[in-house]
């Protein structure tokens, strides 16, 4: 157990070092540095071994991500991303990992996959923590949050690609999104372990 605690204490230091080292440098200007740091962090967040997340207080949050269209975002083991109206669904329990001020990655607790967005603006679940899995979290005036890709945006207008869910729960391509659309507005909702299925409850407790 001491070894596990040491690993996550090291992760705590890594994340803090990542935040202070990155500073205000745009991600696009430091791809090599960012990729190296993401690799180090990803290596310490491997799925499957019991862990004590007390060391990550304030850095790692477990939430559901509720879209203004009425769906919770889910990340499935096969890499697909979709929305569900079911509260506390198995694949809708997510880990929010703070990488720097305003920069986060999101990972499914059950699937172990990171939320990613490719160059076409499509959402997917990634086994690796890459630059496609880093999003800028912004608090909007209506108390909702938006999550913009830090890697892809419109080349002509510089308009960002946002995480979004359509009115039927399907993922909306990032190139079709705008900041003030309700498709892009999300609320991170707290997780109540007592409402989770028994299998997911065990994962929530031990991972």
Swiss-Prot record:
- Quote the subunit structure annotation: Interacts with FGFR1 and FGFR2.
Entry annotated with the keyword Lyase? no
What does the UniProt keyword field contain?
Answer: Glycoprotein, Growth factor, Phosphoprotein, Secreted
Annotated disulfide bonds: none
| Biological processes, Gene Ontology terms | fibroblast growth factor receptor signaling pathway; neurogenesis; positive regulation of brown fat cell proliferation; positive regulation of cell population proliferation; positive regulation of endothelial cell chemotaxis to fibroblast growth factor; positive regulation of MAPK cascade; regulation of cell migration
The molecule here is called Fibroblast growth factor 16
Q: Which gene encodes it?
A: Fgf16
Species whose genome carries this gene: Rattus norvegicus (Rat)
A matching Pfam family = FGF
């Amino acid at each position: 157990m001491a070894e596990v605690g040491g690993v996550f204490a090291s992760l705590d230091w890594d994340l803090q070092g990542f935040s202070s080292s990155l500073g205000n440098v745009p991600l696009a200007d430091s791809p090599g540095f960012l990729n190296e740091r993401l690799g180090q962090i990803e290596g310490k967040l491997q799925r499957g071994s019991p862990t004590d997340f007390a060391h990550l207080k304030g850095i790692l949050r477990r939430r559901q991500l509720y879209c203004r269209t009425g769906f919770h975002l889910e990340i499935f083991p096969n890499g697909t991303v979709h929305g569900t109206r079911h509260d506390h669904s198995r694949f809708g329990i997510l880990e929010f990992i703070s990488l720097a001020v305003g920069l986060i990655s999101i990972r499914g607790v059950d699937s172990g996959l990171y939320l990613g967005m490719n160059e076409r603006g499509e959402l997917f679940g990634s086994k690796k923590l890459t630059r496609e899995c880093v999003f800028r979290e912004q608090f909007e005036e209506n108390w909702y949050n938006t999550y913009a890709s830090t890697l892809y945006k419109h080349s002509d207008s510089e308009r960002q690609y946002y995480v979004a869910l359509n009115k039927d729960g399907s993922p909306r391509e990032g190139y079709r999104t705008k900041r003030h659309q309700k498709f892009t507005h999300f609320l991170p909702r707290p997780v109540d372990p007592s409402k989770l299925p028994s299998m997911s409850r065990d994962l929530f407790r031990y991972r």
